[in-house]
């Protein structure tokens, strides 16, 4: 069973599961799946324009997770996020679309920096002195560096897409880039070996996460204990200093204050005279 909704409605459980997204599917006009139809119907986007060279739409997929009932895994859950790497600066272009497929520029798009290990703008090598204006495309793609001369010469959607793909990492996913979340729920069949293997994989992963959280709590307790011990030692040290000082000055702070008051009285008396 699939449920599709906005990121906001799934943010709490996504934060709880903290899923790892491993599979990245480029959404193009050739994509034939549930999401393609949903994109057409719900987002009002005609996928025919989204070729492999002009699309900035990606579907990312999580591992399977389990939800529990009475302490026992009940369902297998998987999340799919439709994300957009960026969009054309021209508001008349559809979302997640590289403008001017025949000739486009990085500078024609607003990109989400979080998706890239190195921002594509940085891949444009600014030093033109070492370039003879006749760079080979294969060399450019291997080095991931483009001098402005060659970039302008070879600039088109295909090459721009190659630049983007060379730097993409999905290490961080900005919330505003998530167009929707699809949540797939499947009831666990305990007689199905595939389901059991998925459950075991999740439980092993979940155990590591629980142990990690437990270790963090223990580390916090140890830090608190160490801090309390340090503060206690500091308190004892300063208490001894205070007791030593007051022992020679009347035995208490009250007596010391009386001494100061007496000196003030003598000063006032002598001043009046």
Curated annotation (Swiss-Prot):
InterPro entries: DUF5886. It comes from the Viruses. It holds the Pfam family DUF5886. This is Uncharacterized protein L494.
